[in-house]
Amino acid sequence: MLNFTGQTRRRNVNLGNRTRNSKKDLLEKAKRERERRAQDKLKEDASKTIQKSIRRHFSNVRLFKNTFTSSQLVHMIPAYGGKLIYYISQYDLQQLLKLSHNFLSSYPNSLGNRQLLSLLKLYQDDALVAETLSDLNMDCPTVDEFLDSLSVYLCRASFLSYSSASKLADVIEAWEVMHSSASISIFSISIGSYEKRPFALQFYCILAERNLLPQLINTNPILWDNMAKTYSHCSKGGQKNIAKLLIPNFNNHIAPSVLRSDNDYVLKFYEKAFIDEVIATTANYVSDEDHVKNLMCYIASSPNQSCKNSVLITLLSNKDFVRRLSWEFFHTKFNASKTEAHPLFSVLAQLIDMHLLISTDRELLDYNSVIPIEELKKFTSTLKDFTFRQYWELPKSERNPMLKEAVPLLSKVYERDSRLHFLSTENNPTYWENSEKQFLNLRFYEELQEYEDLYREHLEEESDEDMEKEIDLDKERPPLKSLLLNKMKKRLKSSLRFRKLEILLELPFFIPFEERVDLFYMFIALDKKRLSLDDDHNLINMFTPWASTGMRKQSAIISRDNVLEDAFNAFNSIGERFKASLDVTFINEFGEEAGIDGGGITKEFLTTVSDEGFKDPKHELFRTNDRYELYPSVVYDATKLKYIWFLGKVVGKCLYEHVLIDVSFADFFLKKLLNYSNGFLSSFSDLGSYDSVLYNNLIKLLNMTTDEIKSLDLTFEIDEPESSAKVVDLIPNGSKTYVTKDNVLLYVTKVTDYKLNKRCFKPVSAFHGGLSVIIAPHWMEMFNSIELQMLISGERDNIDLDDLKSNTEYGGYKEEDQTIVDFWEVLNEFKFEEKLNFLKFVTSVPQAPLQGFKALDPKFGIRNAGTEKYRLPTASTCVNLLKLPDYRNKTILREKLLYAINSGARFDLS
């Protein structure tokens, strides 16, 4: 068809899109319709049921209100009990309870009480609690139902007033509910955060104050936790009652888990009031092992060291109690063969440990001290024998667990005795040494060699070439001794030789000091053999240098004006190669000094470096205490730490080469060097050798009364003028935390920790790091601090002139010459200090070598210096040589020798 434009237009016709339903669609539609009708039917039936129930409910309500008389209503509670809550209002129930009071309170059997308690079980607040309880027939106890209902109520309720809680307590008291074993149920409800549910805590406090507490508490940790919370919030009377309940029950598996928690309320158990209750409860039963075991568990469960210290300090303040414990221990057969801890031993050991910590030397030696010195001696003897027998006679798997406390305590007593000699007296200098012949005569060199090999294997991955790696001071240290001993034990099966090695490493004082010194130098000899530094290799290297397998000599040119700096630059970076022979050339203002090193120049170098590094104030590397003993400066930077590290290596080299140096270190510093495995930690008793004034002031503080401490207005902060902070908090928020009698020991501990541990850690670690490059830690740890000082600088108290005479070499003299005879007579007549000055004059050190004068290298020599009587004796300390003119006159010899040693006249190396 043509339109008016003359074109054909296509026409679109919509015929619809409806399709014919299939059979499947029809069936699906019918199914949906049936399901819809079924749902509608269910809704209709449910609606009818609800309407029927509502009509029945209102009918019952009308029935209760309008049908029954008062005489009939009183039977409602016995008949329906808790069901009434669903049918009548709270107000109507309250009226019903009042109406039924006389009837129910005299109900002839337990039904009335049971039904009343079924109401209590369903309450969610305390609106009707008082009325419900007042209706109970108190002459007809229903304890089980009461406990069940009360437990449910405490879990459901949102509120419980003081008066309602008091009425509940009245029922508990009247019915003697706490005699029932089920009574723990009402204390075993997790009250959660007591800030959110204070009513439950208030209820427990009321019960505690009236001493309505459960009899059995060892079965439920929630109960223990609730008692702890309650104790922290109730009155003194309530606390006293809870203390009586808990104190006999610390010896169970539940108490430690509660006491060691992070909750603040647990700390109340470690305040003086509770500790006094513990003492009062235990004091009359120290002969009863269970009571003492309970005390032991209480101490062991302390949530932190501060709490434990508080317990021990409070116990020590009760002299009578400590004396009873001590008397009981010494009058009871101590069975060391038992496999479990001995309670009396454990408690007494911890008390003695604390006594050693806080007592001055004078207090420790006092016969009237809380632990008299005689008691300490007796206990130490028992402890010493027990510990040795356990180590020597038993493999590790069979040893008593008490060794965990015994070994560190015995070591502390030994350290204190090393200075005070209250055990190792003049009459018994070998007190600590074990005299058993089999033990003394047993040789264990193979075990020592194996331990050394294992130690070196362990160090293989740790190179000391990289100084920055060496000075990684915060690196965690593994317990090396235990690790290596356990490896050895698997192969050696705990032989006697292995046990002696254990004793050497963990209880070295059982081995005579002289033997330990020999073992120390044997360790060095083994190490020199490992590095091919021994004499045999030196001889081979001299004639066949092309075949050398050992370390080569380390050469350096050292200016007399910059000894320490030149030595540091030459030798600090070479690591273990510093153990090799040193080829040192000194230069002074005139040029190179002449001399061939036969050991003398090396000694001169080491002693000169030591003198400058330790004693020259311009370097500010070390400080002195009030006894002029040295320790590393606590003001340092990275460069100073490296120099301190190097000086540690120098001291190690001196020990390695048997070179004594005239340096006295502070005792606390030496103890730190021997405490590597425990992170160099020091305790309060070490503070005296760091700052005696501070130490004595803190001792006075510990002995002050509550009012005296309060008057000082002390807080947990410390002035630190050398720090950028100026004032340092000892604990978080320390500037606002005041020191009291209860926390004074914590304050003392924190001051000690800051002064000795935090401030000294890096410089001590640096010095020890350098020292241990040359001297392995376990070589040093065979000794105590006093013995280590003797290794470094010799034995001051004993100068054996006969030994010196027998180890003297003469040049230009014979032993029978008049001048030599006069010399030894004059030396014998010298005062002790003059003898020390003579030794310093000829050897540079005013002490004798530990192994006697035979250990001097080179040996002491006397050379004829001519016949001019006006000349003074001179010395070359580098070769231990005295140049003595042939005076042939005893008086002149005495005058000249005294003048020389007091003026320090010496020759240099020319």
From Swiss-Prot:
Superkingdom assignment: Eukaryota
Protein function: Non-essential E3 ubiquitin-protein ligase that specifically catalyzes 'Lys-29'- and 'Lys-48'-linked polyubiquitin chains. Accepts ubiquitin from an E2 ubiquitin-conjugating enzyme in the form of a thioester and then directly transfers the ubiquitin to targeted substrates. Associates with the proteasome and promotes elongation of ubiquitin chains on substrates bound to the proteasome. Elongation of ubiquitin chains on substrates bound to the proteasome promotes proteasomal processivity. Also promotes ubiquitin elongation of 26S proteasome subunit RPN10.
Domain HECT: residue ranges: 810-910
Pathway annotation from the record: Protein modification; protein ubiquitination
EC code(s) of this entry: 2.3.2.26
Note: Present with 3120 molecules/cell in log phase SD medium.
Family: Belongs to the UBE3C family.
Any GO BP annotation: ERAD pathway
Residue positions, PTM N-acetylmethionine: M1
Assigned keywords, A-Z: Acetylation, Cytoplasm, Nucleus, Transferase, Ubl conjugation pathway
Single GO MF annotation: ubiquitin protein ligase activity
Phenotype of the disrupted gene, per the record: Cells are viable.
Transferase among keywords: yes
Active-site residues, record numbering mapped to chain: C878
Assembly mode: Interacts with 19S proteasomes.
Region annotation Disordered: where it falls in the sequence: 1-25
Known catalytic reactions: S-ubiquitinyl-[E2 ubiquitin-conjugating enzyme]-L-cysteine + [acceptor protein]-L-lysine = [E2 ubiquitin-conjugating enzyme]-L-cysteine + N(6)-ubiquitinyl-[acceptor protein]-L-lysine
Localization: Cytoplasm, Cytosol; Nucleus
A cellular component term, taken from the record's GO annotations: proteasome complex
Full protein name: E3 ubiquitin-protein ligase HUL5
Pfam family, one: HECT
Variant or mutagenesis effect after changing C878A: Abolishes E3 ubiquitin-protein ligase activity
Entries under InterPro entries matching the protein: E3A/B/C-like, HECT_dom, Hect_E3_ubiquitin_ligase
